[in-house]
From Swiss-Prot:
Binds 1 zinc ion per subunit. The lineage of its organism: Bacteria, Bacillati, Actinomycetota, Actinomycetes, Pseudonocardiales. The active site is at E388. This is Zinc carboxypeptidase. It comes from Saccharothrix mutabilis subsp. capreolus (Streptomyces capreolus). The keyword Translocase does not apply.
Amino acid sequence: MSPKRRRLMAAALGACVALVLPLHAGSAQPSTAKTPERTVFEVTASTPEARTRVARTGVDVLGQDGDKLTVVAEPRQQWALRATGLRVENLGDYDAQLQALGKVDFTDPQVGTQDFPSGYTGYHNFQETVTELNQTVTDHPNLVRLSSVGKSYQGRDLWMLKLSDNPAVDENEPEVLFTCNMHAREHLTVEMCLRIIKQYTDGYATNPTIKNLVDSREIWIIPMVNPDGVEYDIATGSFRSWRKNRQPNSTAVGTDPNRNWGYQWGCCGGSSSSGSSETTAARRRSPPRRSPHPHFVNTRVVGGVQQIKTHIDWHTYSELILWPYGYTYNDTAPGLDAQQASAFSTLGRRMASLNGTRRQQSSDLYITDGTINDWLWGVHKIWSYTFEMYPKSSSPGFYPRDTVIATQTQRNDSAVELFLSYSDCVPRIIGRTC
């Protein structure tokens, strides 16, 4: 930990405990209390169809634990949430809960302008992530190459690390892509990408399994897909629970980067057209907003063959492993046959057995469209998974203390190793060839 972080004020407020306040048909007394701008609710939704009804109201779905969805609703969305007919329980003022997690003391000269509150300083902000990547290049110049896939809306470089035994050469080897922090508030995912980088560089000289995987693969790692959103989430010194990027659309600021991929985009009610919704895609009558990340994937088609074979998109939270399709409840659909679905589910099940999470097709959670998993598979036949990391439930939700970083990233080591081992030919896991 840097000296700057050790000198941060230690008097930040402790983690909040949300009060469970059930909704009643009537109220006992009129209240003069100000209506919260955002309220947390727990919704009982035991089927994918019920969860999809909730998601289509435009509320911010935070996570799932069993038959419970934790969501955040603005006042104008609450009537639609109640209209679903599902059991809804009020868990309190969301912004008050975020404030109670702590606030940075910007009067401390050692504190940067973009930093995490006390108890969270082990997380990397954008500049610290860049510093970490540059240090990796210095420490392992023969294993890594750092480049930018382009610029964010606000002009930040979208850094990507290539990990290979010959990083300056485009070798004829299966390529693997890891993406982290697509959603701004999911800070633990940056640490996951940095964990993979550290493990497969520092371990190269001493671990034969790691050496074999690095020697036989080209691994691309993008630790912070959405740096503008990340910096906005922590800019005030308290967490904002910001999900989207910072690119303006016609009605508000921000588009959900994981509802903005072109395959089956906007087809099935899997994202909101409301500008304030946390799953807002670009306007339905216009194409998805351009992003450098799909362009990079397209450039990996060499001689008519896509070089990237597999992909994991890291998210929090709910402790799930998901695979395509998200736009349909069907296990098979155009471009995804029974054998391919079996390979997806078999590898997903094997990985889940190693990190102790649940596994399911994406739409078994609820319908989504315009996602990276559906696009990578539907357009490029890249075996693409989402890992929803720790925690399982809304406590502590998106903001676990930094004391969990080591344990909750190391938890995925064996699953990542298995994933890389099958990245030359995923159907091998069901006894098929490529």
